[in-house]
Amino acid sequence: MPWREVQDVPRRESTHIQSDLERKIDLIDKTVGFAVCGSFCTHHKAMEALEQVKARFTHVVPIVSECTADTDTRFGKAHDLMREMERICDHRVISTVKAAEPIGPQKLLDLLIICPCTGNTLGKLANGVTDTSVTMAAKAHLRNSRPLVIAPSTNDGLAASAVSIGALLPRKYIYFVPFGQDDPERKPTSLVSDFSLVADAAQAALEGKQLQP
C-alpha cells in the first residue's frame, strides 16, 4: 500500500477524536437562569434560544413570569410551554416570587437571561419594582454582582419603554441582547432582540462584555 494511503487512516481517526474533544471544551461549566416573560408572539423564538443556551452551558434553570404561567393564548398553552422548558433544561420551572427569592442568598446562578423581556418587566427593572417571579429573580441575582442579560421584546420600545431601556443600558452587570425594529412600517415603535444571539450575548456577559450588533 502506498505510504500516503497508510497515513490517511490515522489522520481521519485523529480528526474525529479532536472533534469530540472540542465539543466537550465548548460546553461552559456555568449555571444559567432563563426567564420568560409574556411576549407570547415571541415564545417560539425564545424556545429556540433556550435550546441554544442549553447546548452552550452545563446547567440551565427555567423561570417564567406569573403571566406566562397562567395565560393560554393563540400562540400556545401555558402548560405546554412550561413542560417544554422543563424538557429542554431537565429542571423544574420556577414560577413564583417565593421560589425565585433563594436565587440571591444561595447564589444559585452564574448568569440570568430574561428572554423575552416585555416593556412591563423593563419598567419594573428600571424602577426597582419586585412583584413577579422574574423581577425577583433579577433582583436576587444582581445582589451577587453577577451578570443579567436582557432580550427586549416590546411594542413601545421607541416610545414609553425607551425610558426604561435608557435607564438600564448604563447599569453595572446589566447587558442586552442586540435589538432593533422588527416592523418599522406597521409598528414603528416596536423593538425585538435578535434571539439567535442570546447564547453569544450570555457568553460575552460572563466575560464582562456587551455583545455588539
Explain the meaning of each model-derived region.
Residues 2-148, 153-213:
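A cross-family phosphate/adenosyl-ligand binding-site feature
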